[in-house]
């Protein structure tokens, strides 16, 4: 059995917690066991979230970073925070990267701004 661990950067701004909850809830439409963890600033940490999945009986944790690029957090910090998780296979998905679907969302945001500016 596997669980999904959504990893977010985190921020001193409280709204990051809300974003994490909303994304985790969206993923729960597709996967039974989903938790979220933050690289820094917010709780739960990546380690805490992984331990919660492990305590629910998963034997594999699929880590999904909500990051755009494979920088230091992806290459160093995420694996380091998962080191103490024993007895569970850890698989880390690639960051979002450059993706046409993201470009579509960005295009929509530009169009929204243009529409709203013509109304003012």
UniProtKB/Swiss-Prot annotation:
Pathway linked to the protein: Cofactor biosynthesis; adenosylcobalamin biosynthesis; cob(II)yrinate a,c-diamide from sirohydrochlorin (anaerobic route): step 1/10
Binding residues annotated for Co(2+), in chain numbering: 9, 73
Highest taxon of source: Archaea
Uppermost EC category: lyase
GO biological process, one term: anaerobic cobalamin biosynthetic process
Active site location: 9
Residues annotated for substrate binding in this entry: 43, 68-73
Reaction(s) this enzyme catalyzes, per UniProt: Co-sirohydrochlorin + 2 H(+) = sirohydrochlorin + Co(2+)
One Pfam short name: CbiX
Family the entry assigns: Belongs to the CbiX family. CbiXS subfamily.
Protein name as annotated: Sirohydrochlorin cobaltochelatase
Originating species: Sulfurisphaera tokodaii (strain DSM 16993 / JCM 10545 / NBRC 100140 / 7)
Lineage: Archaea, Thermoproteota, Thermoprotei, Sulfolobales, Sulfolobaceae
């Amino acid at each position: 059995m596997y669980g999904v661990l959504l990893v977010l950067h985190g921020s001193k701004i409280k709204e990051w917690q809300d974003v994490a909850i909303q994304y985790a809830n969206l993923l729960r439409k597709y996967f039974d066991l989903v938790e979220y963890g933050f690289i820094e600033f917010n709780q739960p940490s990546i380690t805490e979230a992984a331990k919660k999945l492990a305590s629910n009986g998963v034997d594999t944790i699929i880590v999904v970073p909500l990051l755009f690029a494979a920088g230091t957090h992806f290459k160093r910090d995420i694996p380091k925070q998962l080191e103490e998780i024993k007895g569970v296979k850890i698989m880390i998905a690639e960051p979002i990267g450059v993706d046409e679907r993201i470009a579509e969302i960005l295009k929509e945001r530009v169009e929204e701004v243009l529409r709203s500016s013509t109304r003012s």
